[in-house]
Every structure is written in structure tokens, then in C-alpha cells.
Regions:
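Membrane-proximal stem/loop segments at transmembrane-domain junctions that anchor or position
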Residues: 284-466
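Membrane-interface transmembrane helices that cradle and orient dolichyl/undecaprenyl
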Residues: 1, 116, 155-188, 218-220, ...
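Transmembrane-helix signature of polytopic, membrane-embedded enzymes
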Residues: 104-131, 149-150, 515, 519
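Membrane-proximal lumenal/periplasmic loop motifs of glycosylation machinery
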Residues: 26-37, 48-75, 79-80, 84-90, ...
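Membrane-interface anchor segments at the N-terminal boundary of transmembrane helices
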Residues: 7, 88, 95, 416, ...
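Transmembrane-helix motifs of polytopic, lipid-linked glycan transferases
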Residues: 88-115, 154, 158, 498-501
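Loop-to-helix entry region of an early transmembrane alpha helix in multi-pass inner-membrane enzymes
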Residues: 68-72, 80-102, 123, 138, ...
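Multi-pass, polyprenyl lipid-linked donor-dependent membrane glycosyltransferases
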Residues: 34, 65, 88-96, 124-159, ...
Length: 574
């Protein structure tokens, strides 16, 4: 393929991706996620009240429930086009997501181990990214996914340049220059990783994947080489390998230190601000997006985590907490290990559903103080603030069953429910007993099932036809779920299979660099999947960041398939 034809094809695919995203952003805007309203309120408060707060009205108390990256991004756009112009935000996000497609193509170009297939790989990866509906839909929302995907690909590309410079065989004449360039790229990786974490705290897992790749990818060849040389040269006089080993180890430490230092500098202003305002060392955001002193029902969350294995239960037993009553009869059988345990859970839920009755019958319950909460906002409902368990402090859930504009007090007055510390302690005791009885189930089997439900989903969230494919009898024919959901499930399978095929191509290349990229991809996906499968809210949107990586690997696989098909065709003609 000539340069002109390749550039033309690249431009066409990029325009297709842009048109798709602009169309979705304009015609399918989605303002339902509560997180979006929280971010928008914070951005407006920064511009209008000059304070970082999630309160919709005075006194606009300072807040730390969300990291400042995305609200400041919104504020920068609002300051130009108006404080409520989310249409402009969506258009900018469409441009950024299109830029992500271009970066995906560049990353695939560098990861392809075969020089003759690099251009085809880039075009294939670009095509996969351009038409990917799973990432495109987030251009229509006021959420962090678009920027996170862009920064993820930029981080992987920076690490690719740094690792490539670091692992390339060089001469004495160019060694210092290449090392300087490599160190610069590690600083860029730290900067991009820090900004990504300011958008979504769990993005730090991608930086961890880069760091592990640096250590493993740099030291493994050294260890293997030393073992091989020891086996071959026993009894013979050979050059001492220790100076080279020391040089490599020194460079690994220096590279990691440079990346970490820049990363810490990015987080420093937010950390200092939280220390000065709240007297807390809080470099990210609180684990459950709670304000200082706010009660979090950790016992109930642990109990849910001891049995929940499917995302369909999240909307039934997590988001309604402190908003709606919870019926013990709706719980699955897996939530109980015995009839006695079910009775204990039923008694606790009875207290939760009817707090007034429990206060009259339980003297201990009468002494429980009301749950401390930050100033309520329509977009920071109790469901979204108190039920999310996330050790990386990712934003609270986007979905719940609250009506817009209702405050937390109004919800509690209407529902008459309350999760008290006493009730929560009861759930904590049951959860610990369940974990002690079946540690394998809790630590291994349930995370595997949650990982499955996150990955093998239709990933139709925020599309007009969103829903679950199974059971088929529950499909909504009015919004054509019978067509769209099977299509999206099929696309998920296609992207997954292409990703696996691309990983196989990298492994089979038997080149150090190719396997290094495979290690980076596996760690970037694996660390995140392990974390979120260990939580009690396995939402499929938490794996949307995997699709850019699958596009890169898929491009590598398509290039291999295309070349093999062409070779077979030429052989038949001959």
C-alpha cells in the first residue's frame, strides 16, 4: 500500500469515527447518570462560587467526594460556552474520543512485531476503534470514561516509547542520548498517569501495570541471560556480567523514580488542599465517596459482597439502600447458607424497613444518632454515596432509582427506612461468618463470577435499548431489544476473540518486544478486572476501558489474518 492510499484510508476511517461520535453525542444525549449531575454542579460552583463543592445551594461547603479532574474539565468548557451547555461538552468529548481512535492506531503500529504489517495493523485497529459502540456512547454522557480512555491510550503509548528506547540495543556512542529520551518518556508517562488518576482514581491501576512491565520486562531478560551464561561458561573465563546488571538495575530504578515523582507532583495540590481544608491525608477521594464523618454501611456492603455474583442484583439491593425498603423474599437463595441465617437477615431488614418500630422495641436502637450526611443534592443520592464500595475511590454509581430533584431527606421521609450502625453491625457479623465458612467461595469463586458478568455483557448501558439479553422473554420489543442486544452481545464476543487472537500473535512472534507489549496489555486488563471483580457492584461499565486495548490487539490479529488469506489466495492462483 502506497503512502497516499494509506493516508487516505486512515483519514476515511477517522472521519467515520468522528461522524459516528458527533451523531451519538448530538442525537442520543444522556443526562440520567447521577455522577454527571455531581460533576456539573461542582464545575458550576467553581465558576460561580469559587469553591470546590457539590452543594446546590449555600453555604457551599468544600467537598472531596470527587476528584477535581473532570469537574475542572467541565468548568473550562462552561467558562467559554455557558454554565449549562452540556451539548458543547459532548461535542468536545466526541473530538477527544476520535483522537483516542488515532492514538489506538499509532499504538497498534508500534506493537505490531512484523514491520511489513504495521500499516495494515494500524488501519485495522483504527477501524475497530472508530465503529466501537461500547466506547462511543460515553460521548453522550457527562462522565469520565471518554477522557479516561484517551489518557489510557496516551499512557500506554508513552510507556511504549519509553520501553522501546530502554530495551533497544544501542552503541556506546548513542547510549546516553537514548537513555535521556527514555527518561523523558517515563516522565511523560507519570504526567499522563497522574492526570488520568485525577479523572478516575482506578486509572492508577494502569500506571501500576506500566510500572510492573518496566520491572519485569527489564529484569527478566537479564536474569535469563545470567542463567544461560552461567550454564554455558562454567569453568571458563568469561566477562563479568555484574557491571551490566548493575547498570540495568540502576536504570530501572531511575525510570521508576522519575515516573513516580512526576505522578506524585500531579497529585500534590489536591492532597495539600484536602489536608488544609479537612485535616485529612487524602491524595485521591474517599473509598465510598463519603464526606468526613459520614456513616458508611460497611457491614451491609461486606454481606452483599459475600453472595452477590451478578450485576442484576446491584439495582435491587445496593442502590436502593436508604432509599427504598428491601424485601428478604427477593434475595436469591445464594444469599443464605441456612434457614437460620435467612431469619437473621430478615430480622435485620425488618429493623431497616421499619426503624420506628425497632426504636420502640429496642432500647439500643433508640440511642442511635441519625446518620451523618453531607448537604444533600439531587445528584448525590444516598444510593450513590453510601453503597459503593471502591478501594480506588472511583466515582459513585451512575444509576439509581431516585427521581430527579429529590433530596435525601425527602427520600427517607417517604420510604421510612434507615440503616443504623446497630443494623450494620449485624450484617457485618453475618458476613464474617459466611466468609469464615467458605473462604474459597468469597475470595475466588464469587470474583470469577463477577468478572464473567462484567465482561460477557451486552455493554448497552446508556443506549436507548439498554438491558440484559437473558432471559429472552423479558426483552422489550417496543425499543427493539430483540435486535440490538443480541447484536451487542455478538460484538462483545467479536472484540474479545480478536483481542485473544492478537495476544496469541504477539506471543507467537517470539520477540522480546512483542511479549513485552503482551505483558503490558495483560497487566492493564488483569489488574483492573481483579479489582472490580472483588467488589460488590460488578457493573459492566467498569470494563469499558478494556476495549481500546482489545482494538489494538484486534488490529494485530486482523493484519495476521489478512496477510495469511492473501498468501493462501496467491498460492491457489499459482
Amino acid at each position: 500500500m502506497t503512502n497516499g492510499r494509506w493516508l487516505l484510508a486512515f483519514a476515511i476511517f477517522l472521519l467515520i469515527g468522528l461522524a459516528f461520535r458527533v451523531y451519538v453525542a448530538h442525537w442520543l444525549p444522556n443526562d440520567t447518570p447521577d455522577d454527571g449531575r455531581v460533576y456539573a454542579q461542582m464545575a458550576r460552583n467553581v465558576l460561580e462560587q469559587h469553591v470546590y463543592s457539590h452543594d446546590p445551594e449555600a453555604p457551599f461547603n468544600p467537598s472531596l467526594i470527587r476528584l477535581p479532574g473532570y469537574p475542572l474539565f467541565l468548568a473550562s468548557i462552561y467558562s467559554v460556552v455557558g454554565h449549562t451547555n452540556n451539548g458543547a461538552v459532548r461535542f468536545v468529548q466526541a473530538l477527544i474520543d476520535t483522537a483516542s481512535c488515532a492514538l489506538i492506531a499509532v499504538l497498534a503500529f508500534y506493537w505490531q512485531p512484523d514491520e511489513k504489517k504495521k500499516r495494515v495493523t494500524a488501519l485495522a485497529a483504527l477501524a475497530l476503534a472508530a465503529v466501537c459502540p461500547f466506547t462511543t456512547i460515553y460521548t453522550a454522557t457527562i462522565l469520565t470514561e471518554v477522557l479516561t480512555n484517551f489518557l489510557l491510550v496516551a499512557l500506554l503509548l508513552s510507556a511504549t516509547f519509553a520501553l522501546g528506547k530502554f530495551t533497544t540495543e544501542d552503541t556506546e556512542k548513542t547510549r546516553k542520548q537514548q537513555w535521556t529520551r527514555s527518561l523523558a518518556w517515563w516522565c511523560v508517562a507519570g504526567l499522563v498517569g497522574g492526570i488520568a488518576v485525577m479523572m478516575r482514581p482506578d486509572a492508577g491501576l494502569f500506571l501500576a501495570a506500566v510500572g510492573l512491565t518496566l520491572v519485569i520486562g527489564s529484569l527478566w531478560p537479564l536474569v535469563s541471560g545470567l542463567r544461560k551464561k552461567t550454564a554455558e561458561d562454567q569453568g571458563s573465563k568469561t566477562k563479568d556480567p555484574r557491571p551490566k546488571a548493575r547498570r540495568i538495575i540502576t536504570r530501572v530504578i531511575a525510570s521508576g523514580a522519575a515516573m513516580s515523582l512526576v505522578f506524585i507532583l500531579v497529585l500534590a495540590p489536591w492532597t495539600i488542599r484536602n489536608w488544609r481544608v479537612f485535616h485529612l491525608f487524602q491524595p485521591l477521594a474517599p473509598q465510598h465517596a463519603e464526606m468526613p464523618g459520614e456513616f458508611v454501611p460497611r457491614g451491609y456492603l461486606l454481606w452483599v459482597r459475600s453472595w452477590l455474583d451478578d450485576q442484576k442484583y446491584v439495582s435491587q439491593f445496593l442502590w436502593p439502600l436508604e432509599v427504598e425498603p428491601i424485601d428478604v423474599d427477593e434475595l436469591p437463595d445464594s444469599a443464605f447458607d441456612s434457614p437460620e441465617e435467612k431469619k437473621r437477615v430478615a430480622a435485620l431488614l425488618e429493623k431497616y424497613n421499619k426503624p420506628d418500630d425497632s426504636e420502640n422495641s429496642d432500647t439500643d436502637g433508640a440511642s442511635v444518632e441519625p446518620t451523618a450526611r453531607p448537604t444533600p443534592t439531587p445528584s448525590a443520592s444516598p444510593a450513590s454515596q453510601s453503597t459503593k464500595s471502591n478501594p480506588t475511590a472511583s466515582p459513585a454509581p451512575d444509576e439509581n432509582n431516585d427521581e430527579e430533584g429529590e433530596s435525601e431527606e425527602t427520600d427517607q421521609e417517604q420510604s421510612g427506612v434507615e440503616m443504623t450502625p446497630d443494623i450494620d453491625a449485624g450484617f457485618m457479623q453475618i458476613a464474617r461468618e459466611r466468609i469464615a465458612r467458605h473462604p474459597f467461595r468469597y475470595y475466588v469463586w464469587l470474583p470469577i463470577k463477577r468478572a464473567r458478568t462484567m465482561w460477557f455483557d451486552t455493554h448497552s448501558q446508556y443506549w436507548p435499548f439498554e438491558g440484559e439479553l437473558l432471559p429472552l422473554d423479558d426483552l422489550d420489543y417496543d425499543i427493539h431489544q430483540q435486535y440490538w442486544l443480541p447484536l451487542f452481545a455478538g460484538l462483545t464476543a467479536i472484540y474479545t476473540l480478536l483481542g485473544l487472537a492478537g495476544a496469541w500473535v504477539l506471543w507467537r512472534a517470539r520477540k522480546f518486544e512483542a511479549r513485552q507489549w503482551l505483558l503490558l496489555a495483560v497487566l492493564a486488563i488483569g489488574l483492573r478486572l481483579v479489582l472490580f471483580s472483588s467488589l460488590e457492584n460488578p457493573e459492566p461499565r467498569y470494563v469499558v476501558e478494556f476495549f481500546p486495548i482489545l482494538c489494538v490487539l484486534g488490529g494485530i490479529a486482523i493484519a495476521r489474518i489478512a496477510v495469511s488469506t492473501r498468501s493462501d489466495s496467491d498460492g491457489v492462483r499459482e
